Amino acid sequence: MLRSSLESCTSTVISGRAGAGKTALATDFARICGRSVAWYKVDAADLELRVFFEYLVASIRQERPGFNEQNIMALAGAAKSDHILRLAEIFVYELLEGEGNPLLIVIEDLHQVCDAEWLVPFLCRFLPLLPRDVHVLITSRTLPPAPLWRMRSKQTLEVIDEATLAFTPEEAVELFETYGLSSEQARHAFERTHGRAAALATQAVAQNKSRTAHKNRPNDPVERRLADQDRAL
């Protein structure tokens, strides 16, 4: 689905709760997409327009050193609502003018600044204008606001929600089999985690570690006690 979105849309939003597998999916795709990757992990302190763009621009300049930040940061520093659309247009212009490989811009945890008044107007102007060699991939714990959601009908935005991210029972069995675990163990883990990717993977790793430790434990009671004492030291 991400590959299809990369080819047909300008942007993708991966939405789901903590542990749904958003970051894992974004990381795997960034590794195989064949593009340079600018990665910005948003923090709650980035709510201020100027701060957000400082980090976003810095991530892009790591991959495109010639990316011109001067006009962007001048507008971002002014922090006026009537500058937002102009800011989006200048940002796109600099992406068009800049030289470099095709680019994937990953904005992780955008929900951290979802209450910012400038965010939706900026994205609604910015995402549809992106050049073909730039794709924006957003991860968020919240679904896109209504104005962004409507962009799906214009083939500008692809949304991958938690239901799409979740493992099916069959996929859970396949995952557990790679750790040498049974389908019964996979079924119980699936029921506990509701198929959430990170939680399911954690269960598989933990059960495999427990199985390996039990398998390697000495059979002789004396040896077993000595081994337990060694681990306690």
Regions found by a protein language model. Name each.
Residues 1-18, 24, 28-29:
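Walker A/P-loop-proximal flanking segment of P-loop NTPase domains
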Residues 3-7, 31-34, 84-165, 180:
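A conserved switch/coupling segment of P-loop NTPase cores
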Residues 14-16, 39-41, 106-109, 137-140, ...:
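Short beta-strand segments
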Residues 20, 25-102, 112-114:
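Conserved phosphate-binding/catalytic loops and adjacent sensor/switch elements of nucleotide-binding enzymes
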Residues 32, 59-66, 98, 113, ...:
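Phosphate/oxyanion-binding loops and surfaces in catalytic or ligand/nucleic-acid-binding neighborhoods
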Residues 152-153, 157-163, 168, 182-233:
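Loop-to-helix "switch" segment enriched in basic
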Residues 166-177:
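Conserved AAA+ ATPase core "coupling" helix
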